[in-house]
Amino acid sequence: MYKFILIFSKILFAQLAFGTLLWGVENTIETQVLFRKAVDGYNNIRIPAICKTKDGTLLAFAEGREAGDKGDIDLIMRRSLDGGKTWSGIEVIWDDKDNTCGNPCPVVDLDTGTIWLLLTWNLGSDSEDAIMTGKSEHPRSPWVTYSNDDGKTWAKPKELPHLRKKDWRWYATGPGNGIQLTRGPHKGRLVIPANHSDRITAERDSKTYRSHIIYSDDHGNSWGLGAIQEPLTNESTVVELADGSVMQNMRSYHGKGNRAVAVSEDGGISFAPVYLDDGLQSPVCQANILRFSWPEKNRSRILFSSPTGGKREGITARLSYDEGKTWPVSKMIHEGPGAYSNMVGLTDGTVGLLVEIGDSSPYETVSFITFDINWLEH
């Protein structure tokens, strides 16, 4: 009887797959498929980003792809008015015919309620390799759109050419969310993580990748270029620390199997030298960081989500109590293939995770997983 119960428990635990409840942990984890490849009108759907508006609406973004990383890619979205329990149908925010519209990076201005969405564009005929090696017709460029009605409608996207230096080729905003600073001399600043390749090379070369910062001090009316990080850094995520500084956590090409990190004391205009965080083991992949609670409100908690080990699998949530210095708490959320992710704090105090997961490939679905902080801590 004991063996049967043990085996049955393992089977139930394994059903974190799609649209089911994970039993055995006080019903604190739920998974919904929001986008599924070859079912929801696109052959592939990737690159999740999510935000919660000032009114509490959830906006889940992704790239709707005709094929892979190049070609006809639309920027798509689903909305939830009830904290992620139910969702609207798929809405297309930007479709530029056969061209590539992607890399969503939303940030909510809590002073004005405006949702700003940074994104990128390139010709659909141009691959990342062609763009980086100078064989494309155009480099990749940053754009912005916004919504003043809780994500119901969006302004026509506008190019931001001044945010790309002359020699830069590849360009990517996020993917994931930006933040608004809440304390210190730069309170109110909108901060967007981004990355680029800094020159043309004969072949695609990871040494040309650099993370950087985009920011706005006037509620999105204008955008400036902040700090540029050291080489071998790429897709990144940002979090505000308790003293008002900004931590940028970056995909690393240093070959050490962990994340690159740097901290800014001036809101992202300059950073201390990059260091490799031995406590954050991760494959070469996008990841996400989220401020869950502040020291003055119960306890400092910063969350981090990413695959673990050397492959894109084992989506894991980690927790830091000391402003990202150490990560003593870690639990796996999805054991199978998984890749890009983005977290959001929900109105009911739980955490929402928009993530690429599947049974045999990370790119089968973009799913919305909710979990309770008590489950993570116990």
Label every model-predicted segment.
Residues 1-4:
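Positively charged n-region of N-terminal signal peptides that target proteins for export
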Residues 23-378:
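Asp-box/BNR beta-propeller blade signature and adjacent active/binding-site loops
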